[in-house]
């Protein structure tokens, strides 16, 4: 199976919102929520996609002809590509009831681990979602990253116990999920965290902690102050705040602000090809997350669909590196791309 076949297979399985488009650019689903769309006028996911396409790569084939190494080492683990499957929750609501969160995470975590990368898993109001996700990660020898919502502190403590039992090599919190309605309405309240609160949570985690949802230099410096091991430059695919800038627009300034800090920087939002991955690394990211296309991969081909999508992205990255005269991720520098 290739990814094109996977898309075709996914269409009958997905609900009425996601169209399993050949190019997942946010246009067909736009402001559909429930569904995979963006909040408000619905242009943030589209902007994410478009801004990567406005960056061009600089070809240079006067270079040593040697094998390309696409591997990334993060927190002591080495991965085949600098690509991670992003966390997705409530798949029945947004993508159709052929799969539930438990089954989705189980397929995704296992397939990603078998094909050399790792998956971030989603969270939800149903406690069984995190229970099953961390079990899948444990079965994959810790090769997964549970993503905990910014619940109240007692709920976070319960989730962290599951994380510890899973042996996950890192844990994340999508701090920007504070913009999701179901979190706002909880009692006791969930949502935004202060630097002090985040510091306490990071100490509780006791494992490399990734803060997802950073879109400003100020936010990045707060995550650094709290003790984060990594951040993810992300606007939650436009699903939590209307009319955000694209992640590609803010990435470089955040990279410069954290220079020399040792904090790893990942980025998501509209990255849809191995060439886009190359662009993100050229702007200073250590790795990327891709979310929505992995949903199509799982719905359209289960584990084989995930394998097909990873192969597609990896092959494209390798080809771009070769044609730009670089043989390792460290050699991908700012002069490898052109911005306008």
PLM features per residue range, with description:
Residues 1-27, 219, 238-261, 272, ...:
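Conserved active-site-proximal phosphate/metal-binding subdomains
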Residues 2-80:
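An N-cap/entry alpha-helix motif that binds or orients negatively charged groups
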Residues 44-130:
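N-terminal functional module of multi-domain proteins
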Residues 49-59, 112, 116, 164-167, ...:
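Structural signal for hydrophobic packing residues in well-ordered secondary-structure cores
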Residues 88-100, 145-154, 207-215, 272:
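Active-site mouth loops of central-metabolism enzymes
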Residues 95, 121-122, 144-151, 183-189:
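Flexible, glycine/proline-enriched loop segments at strand-loop-helix junctions
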Residues 109-110, 138-139, 151-267, 274-297, ...:
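Alpha/beta enzyme core
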Residues 118, 129-155:
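Long, hydrophobic, well-ordered secondary-structure blocks that form the structural core
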């Amino acid at each position: 199976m290739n990814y094109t076949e996977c898309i075709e297979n996914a269409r009958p399985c997905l609900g009425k919102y996601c169209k399993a488009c050949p190019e997942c650019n946010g246009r067909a689903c736009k402001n559909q929520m429930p569904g995979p769309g963006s909040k408000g006028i619905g242009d943030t996911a589209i902007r994410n996609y478009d801004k990567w396409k406005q960056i061009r790569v600089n070809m240079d084939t006067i270079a040593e002809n040697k094998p390309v190494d696409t591997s990334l080492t993060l927190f002591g683990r080495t991965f085949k590509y600098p690509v991670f499957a992003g966390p997705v929750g409530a798949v029945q609501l947004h993508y159709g009831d052929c799969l539930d969160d438990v089954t989705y995470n189980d397929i995704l975590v296992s397939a990603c681990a078998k094909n050399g990368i790792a998956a971030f898993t989603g969270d939800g109001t149903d406690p069984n979602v995190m229970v099953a996700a961390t079990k899948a990660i444990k079965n994959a020898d810790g090769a997964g990253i549970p993503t905990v919502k910014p619940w109240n502190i007692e709920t976070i403590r319960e989730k962290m116990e599951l994380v510890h039992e899973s042996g996950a090599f890192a844990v994340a919190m999508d701090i920007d999920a504070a913009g999701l309605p179901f979190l706002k309405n909880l009692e006791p309240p969930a949502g935004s965290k202060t630097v002090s609160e985040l510091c306490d949570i990071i100490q509780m985690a006791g494992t490399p902690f990734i803060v997802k949802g950073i879109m400003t230099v100020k936010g990045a410096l707060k995550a650094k102050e709290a003790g984060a091991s990594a951040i993810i430059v992300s606007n939650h695919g436009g699903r939590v705040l209307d009319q955000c800038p694209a992640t590609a627009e803010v990435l470089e300034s955040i990279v410069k602000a954290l220079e020399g800090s040792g904090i790893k920087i990942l980025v998501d939002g509209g990255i849809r090809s191995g060439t886009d991955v190359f662009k993100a690394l050229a702007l200073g990211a250590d790795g990327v997350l891709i979310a929505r296309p992995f949903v199509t991969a799982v719905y359209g081909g289960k584990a084989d669909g995930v394998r097909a999508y990873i192969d597609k992205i990896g092959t494209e990255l390798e080809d771009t590196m070769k044609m730009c005269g670089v043989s390792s991720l460290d050699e991908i520098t700012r002069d490898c791309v052109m911005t306008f």
